């Protein structure tokens, strides 16, 4: 379980790296393609779309498959961004990479929380934030070391390396018990939970998931959104949204 959570958290390195690597590459991309502000805008547009799609995708195909899609997307789109021959293709790849980032923002914390034992869940969830910061630092360091060479393609393409390593590691992981329970596959959920929790906590953990799923709000998307901002949690949610800006 710890291996699974650490593997997922490692995707934060790629996410953090993408945040900072464009700072070094920006002036050289502008020189070659004549674009500047659109570079970051394209990524942000993709991130918004990815963040919206992340939850439905994880529920539809599973947490593990979603993680594989994210890691593969990071790898492929980072490489295609680095080798783009034109501004149009470059921006298209930035949008697709942004979608991948948006997906990861939604899916990775869920995958970690559902794959970790209750006693270690908080610490392992924090690991994702730590790896994001590590990625940001690496982005600046790599950009600084390659800056004199004008090799912006290398600066952007290096992001594929950690993503590919995580992709290989994810193959060894399992689906989460919560997703199996969501799909009504309780026997598989029990087997998955037995790999995470000690024997005496397996059934209580499954009962907790069962109760959580039974209390999920039903109805339309707009109805669920209204419920999110109803009652005592509205102020906290508004604060979190404003903090993001």
Residue ranges and their predicted role:
Residues 1-245:
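Transmembrane-helix signature of 12-pass secondary carriers
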